[in-house]
Amino acid sequence: MCELLGICFNKKVNVELSLNSFKHRSEDHPNGWGIAFYPDGFVRVIKEPIKMNEALLAECVRWTKIKSNIFIAHIRKASAGSESYVNTHPFVRKLEDKEIAFAHNGTLLGYEDLELDGYYPIGETDSEYVFCYLLSQIEKREIEWNKEGFDEMLDILLDINYYGAFNCLFSDGEYLFAYKDYRGRRELHFLKRKPPYGRIRLEDEDYIINLGDVKSVREEGFIIATNPLTNEDWKSFENGELMVFKNGEMIYSNKRLTDLELKILKILRESPHRVSLKKIIENLEYLSRNIRHDASVVRIGIRSLLDKGYIKQDSRDTVNWDDLEATFYTKPEKRVEIDKRLKGFRWRRNRIIMS
């Protein structure tokens, strides 16, 4: 099988440390390697149909210390398609004004039943074919990057998953999407990395490093990998789980409460009154030292909490739920569960501002 690596941080970071661990696994994945990143908002792709730990270009990527908020990397053990550049991940296509990079782990059969429209593969792989199908459907359904759009995107991924093992990563340079096979036929893990930073051990080599020596206290974000790369607190995706990350924060999951949602719940629980969307945004900006929250992201969190049944919009409101003046409170029957989930959930700043 192939292996995936995805990175999304709040600031541009150097990928050398994670790539160093990742490349050691290429001995069992000899059919190609590649990396996509967005140093200036536009995608760059470096890939070769050779073993990563024998690739001079891979060493150049490590030592030139390229920086980006988002990275997608892939090492290939071919199950479909020959060893060639066009069959090597990540694949890239333009979707309106977005440049989408995509990588897949798994094997699909009968996927040609999925009808393409406007996007077509150059190579021979199942991966590139279903990437084109994903883009065709996003364009056809006019999917937007919001909670409702992510739900629709999940439906498309589940349709693809019907044809076999399917884990994938894709990004437009602003959002990072990560999906795990609904039958759990491939592993996928994630790590939330945030300060204070300490010593860690790389899983694939006898090497210990103090992250505090190489990381800024302002850096935080998520790393996604097929298998854990370090001895840190990695967690498994749920089967059939889609996660979406932006600016170093998980902003959507169909299987769990995200940190964004927990922050919103904390604001609502610590207020004696209903809280407006505008005030929630202000509090998130005040309470979150490193992560920026624009209104579109906060609306994703609010919509998710409404759909998951944790909060309600006040019946006295005369505006739609997504209006800045809309007000919310936690459902009384959910407050015991919410308080349990918030136990131990801390921010650097603790005082909620309501005036």
Curated annotation (Swiss-Prot):
Highest rank taxon of the organism: Archaea
Q: Which residues form the active site?
A: C2
CDD domains xrefs = YafJ (cd01908)
Keywords in alphabetical order: Glutamine amidotransferase
Q: Which PROSITE patterns match?
A: GATASE_TYPE_2
The record places domain Glutamine amidotransferase type-2 at 2-248
Instruction: Give each disulfide bond as a residue pair.
Output: none
Q: Which InterPro entries match?
A: EgtC-like (IPR026869), GATase_2_dom (IPR017932), Ntn_hydrolases_N (IPR029055), WH-like_DNA-bd_sf (IPR036388)
Q: Which Gene3D superfamilies match?
A: Glutamine Phosphoribosylpyrophosphate, subunit 1, domain 1 (3.60.20.10), Winged helix-like DNA-binding domain superfamily/Winged helix DNA-binding domain (1.10.10.10)
Q: What is this protein called?
A: Uncharacterized protein MJ1515
Q: Which organism is it from?
A: Methanocaldococcus jannaschii (strain ATCC 43067 / DSM 2661 / JAL-1 / JCM 10045 / NBRC 100440) (Methanococcus jannaschii)
